[in-house]
Structure formats: C-alpha cells, structure tokens
Design a protein with these regions (language model features):
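Post-Walker A helix-loop "phosphate-sensing" segment adjacent to the P-loop in P-loop NTPases
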Residues: 22-29
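ATP-dependent small-molecule kinase phosphotransfer cores
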Residues: 29-88, 101-121, 127, 131-140
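P-loop (Walker A) phosphate-binding loop of NTP-binding proteins
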Residues: 8
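Small-molecule kinase domains that catalyze NTP-dependent phosphoryl transfer to phosphate-bearing small molecules
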Residues: 117-172
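Hydrophobic anchor at the beta1->P-loop junction of P-loop NTPases
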Residues: 5
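ATP-binding Walker
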Residues: 11
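Walker A/P-loop
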Residues: 14
C-alpha cells in the first residue's frame, strides 16, 4: 500500500508520516527534504526557492519524475508531497490541516530544528512565522494551480482529511492509523 501525505505547514504531517512508516515498517520518502536540499544547493532559503519554483516548472518536474519512479519501483511506502496524491492516484491520500495561528506556534517551536535551518530567514516571533506561512501557502496554491491546474487543498482529492488543530500528535497518529488499518483489512 502506498500512503501519500499532504497538508498545511505545521499540521504534523512529517511527524505523523514518520510514525506511520515506522509502525508499518515502510520506507518514507519526504519530498520536502528534496525541496530544502535544492534550495540549499542554491544558497537560498525555502521561501526564496519557492518563489523561483513558482516561475520555473522544471524544478518541480525533477520532484515529479522522482515520485513517478518511486511508484513504479516500490509497492509499499509512505510519501510526503504536495502532488503525490495526483501522480499516484492509487495511493491512500491523507491531508492534514491546521489553523494558521496554531501552525505558526508549532513551527516557531521547531525553529531550532536542524532540518528547518534554511526554512526561512531568522524569525523572532510567531507573528513573523504566521506571515511567512501565509505567503508560502498562497505561493503554493498559485504555483500548483499554474503548473498543474491542481487545487492541492481541495478536500475531495483526499481519502482522509483531518484537522489537527486541537489534537496531540498521538491523537493524530492514532486516527490516521485507524483509517489506514480500515483500508488494509479490506
């Protein structure tokens, strides 16, 4: 089974995907890291690189090709990506959403995380992060609509949509696993 995760920044999708991959003993592929690495190679923040990608679809094409290759070569895995649900239609598609203010609080708490070092400029407050998240969300929405004609937040694109705003990571994980297990049993 292939499980694809998408969701709002700060929704807990990476943490949940890691836990699901560990529980199912599936490999996990994280396209966000690929994106961060591409930004780092260009000495850019994720915000800066995101703006470049909006104008240049060839950068997204590298990620798309990799997603298609993964689906062709692997039977069971977890993938985090804005577009995996589209490129792997047979996947179990999960979207995690979160209130913007809660997302900013979560991301601010993670700013010391090594993985987020080039996420954006050094922000000093949740309000600054909130503004950055709003810009990234708008940029993502416009980018995927422009390059693919996709509304990446349209809930009908997904098999499970879960609002994580008032849930602990354990509660999110349990709800996601309950859903996945219900599909495995069929």
């Amino acid at each position: 089974m292939i499980v694809s995760f998408n969701g709002d920044h700060g929704s807990g999708k990476s943490t949940t995907a890691k836990k699901v991959a560990h529980t199912l003993n599936y490999p996990r592929f994280y396209m966000g890291q690929m994106f961060r690495d591409m930004a780092k190679e260009r000495n850019m923040t994720v915000d800066e690189f995101d703006r470049i990608c909006k104008a240049d679809a060839s950068l997204d094409k590298k990620v798309d090709d990799y997603i298609l290759k993964l689906a062709k070569e692997n039977k069971d895995f977890i993938i985090e990506s804005r577009t995996a649900w589209h490129f792997i239609p047979k996947s179990l598609k999960i979207y995690l959403k979160v209130d913007e203010r809660e997302a900013a609080e979560r991301v601010f708490k993670e700013t010391d995380n090594e993985n987020r070092k080039n996420e954006s400029k050094n922000y000093n407050s949740e309000d600054e992060i909130l503004e950055s998240l709003k810009k990234r969300k708008k940029n993502d929405d416009e980018r995927y609509l422009k390059h693919y004609g996709l509304d990446i937040r349209k809930e009908s694109n997904y098999d499970l949509v879960l609002d994580t705003t008032n849930l602990s990571i354990e509660e999110v994980f349990n709800k996601v696993m309950e859903f996945i297990n219900s599909k495995i049993e069929k």
